[in-house]
């Protein structure tokens, strides 16, 4: 059996939704569409901007095509603007859909699959590498430094890290290089 059960999704997403600004549309008592935003900071050409990170965008299929999400997005973006957030970001599951809704792509994720035979067996270098948990303090500090010098990089808080790893934690390894001086 694959996929997520309703209770698993609720349990997984609740920590995000309780700390985000959530807009919803109801049909009577039933939530039929939602749009959630939580605050982050982003390095844009060496200046730090407050941004709204959009997540949990959904509408039941039988309600699509009625402009509900468009209205929720406009309301959410208007609120972000009032709060001084200069940009809204999301990771789209469908680039054509969000492009149709007026969103633009600012970056791409690149993944590499490296076979073990492509890695040198022994390389003399000072220091060592250790696998660490995704919530490792040194890893987060390293990422914060990287964000401070890298255009387009988010400064991730605990909530953003939870959201980032939510779907990949089981099959992802994090490693930190420690330089011995």
What are these regions (language model features)?
Residues 82-86, 92-110:
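Conserved active-site alpha-helix within GNAT-family acetyltransferase domains
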Residues 63, 80-81:
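Hydrophobic pocket-lining residues that define ligand/cofactor binding sites across diverse proteins
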Residues 109-181:
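Amide-forming acyltransferase catalytic core, primarily the GNAT-like/NAT-type
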Residues 41-48, 114:
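A short, polar/charged loop-to-alpha-helix boundary motif
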Residues 63-75:
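Conserved acetyl-CoA pyrophosphate-binding loop and the N-cap/start of the following alpha-helix
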Residues 2-44, 151-174:
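Active-site rim helix/loop that mediates acceptor-substrate recognition in acyltransferases
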Residues 30-35, 52, 180-181:
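Glycine-rich phosphate/pyrophosphate-binding loop shared by adenosine-nucleotide-utilizing enzymes
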Residues 54-64:
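A short, internal acetyl-CoA/4′-phosphopantetheine-binding micro-motif in the GNAT/acyltransferase core
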């Amino acid at each position: 059996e694959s996929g997520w059960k309703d209770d698993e999704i609720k349990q997984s997403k609740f920590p995000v939704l309780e700390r985000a600004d959530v807009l919803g549309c109801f049909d009577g008592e039933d939530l039929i569409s939602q749009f959630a935003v939580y605050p982050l900071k982003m390095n844009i050409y060496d200046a730090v901007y407050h941004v709204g990170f959009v997540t949990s965008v959904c509408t039941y299929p039988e309600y699509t095509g009625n402009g509900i999400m468009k209205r929720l997005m406009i309301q959410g973006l208007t609120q972000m603007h009032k709060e001084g957030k200069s940009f809204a970001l999301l990771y789209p599951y469908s680039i054509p859909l969000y492009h149709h809704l007026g969103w633009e792509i600012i970056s791409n994720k690149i993944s590499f699959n490296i076979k073990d035979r492509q890695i040198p067996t022994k390389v003399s270098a000072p220091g060592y590498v250790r696998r660490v948990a995704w919530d490792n303090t040194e890893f987060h500090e390293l990422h914060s430094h990287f964000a401070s010098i890298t255009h387009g990089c988010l400064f991730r808080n605990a909530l953003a890290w939870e959201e980032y790893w939510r779907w990949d934690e089981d099959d992802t390894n994090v490693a930190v290089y420690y330089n011995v001086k």
